[in-house]
Amino acid sequence: MSIVHPDTSKYEFNFEPFLRKEYSFSLDPDRPVCQYYNSREGIKSCPNGARCPNKHVLPIFQNKIVCKHWLRGLCKKNDQCEYLHEYNLRKMPECVFFTKNGYCTQSPECQYLHVDHKSQLEECEDYNMGFCPSGPACTKKHVKKVLCPRYLVGFCPLGKDCDWSHPKFKVPSEHSKLRIKKDEHINTRKMDEERERRLNAIINGDILVT
């Protein structure tokens, strides 16, 4: 050990295990998978716990993250690999870094799905209510949902936790409200139409003016 390059491996801060556990700081991404870790029992299954230098693959990411070695054609584990050996967007979890920042430092070799929420279409409110007058020409997204039979009858005890759709009543706008005209407006319009017909008859010579 020298003064210029001291050996600090025996020293550790109290917050380092937390950083390794929550954010995987100072960990080699190519480190091997821990053979003691069991996803069912969690961190207790590994004798080293959060201080383990190897990977603890969570069950939510099991066989969902694309193997970066497979992308390069260099993976030697074949079917024994704990990562996904296919580029299926439906199975890939969303990249949290890209969602928060709008870019990814690992692109184009990122193992997670990059979803641009700004480019996604909004759901059609009319369709969710039960009918969209625009039909296939609608510029918004039509998401097919199964209507809740209990809600259609009148009440669903599950409320917001129900897996089926609860269509909501939309308050009609001002232009869609039924307008009731008064009798005086109707009579005035009839008188105007009668005057117009009489004037046309005079012009055409059907009625003689004395």
Swiss-Prot record:
Family per record: Belongs to the CPSF4/YTH1 family.
First-listed, main subcellular location of the protein, grouped into a coarse class: nucleus
Entry-linked InterPro entries: CPSF4/Yth1 (IPR045348), Znf_CCCH (IPR000571), Znf_CCCH_sf (IPR036855)
Biological process (GO), any one: mRNA processing
Keyword Glycoprotein belongs to the record: no
Subcellular location: Nucleus
Name the UniProt record assigns to this protein: mRNA 3'-end-processing protein YTH1
Zinc fingers, C3H1-type class: 28-59, 61-88, 89-117, 118-142, 143-169
Keyword annotations from UniProtKB, A to Z: Metal-binding, mRNA processing, Nucleus, Repeat, RNA-binding, Zinc, Zinc-finger
GO cellular component: nucleus
SUPFAM superfamilies xrefs: CCCH zinc finger (SSF90229)
Molecular-function annotations in GO: RNA binding; zinc ion binding
Pfam hit, one: zf-CCCH_2
Source domain of life: Eukaryota
Coiled coil stretches, renumbered: none
Species in which this protein is naturally found: Kluyveromyces lactis (strain ATCC 8585 / CBS 2359 / DSM 70799 / NBRC 1267 / NRRL Y-1140 / WM37)
Job of this protein: Component of the cleavage factor I (CF I) involved in pre-mRNA 3'-end processing.
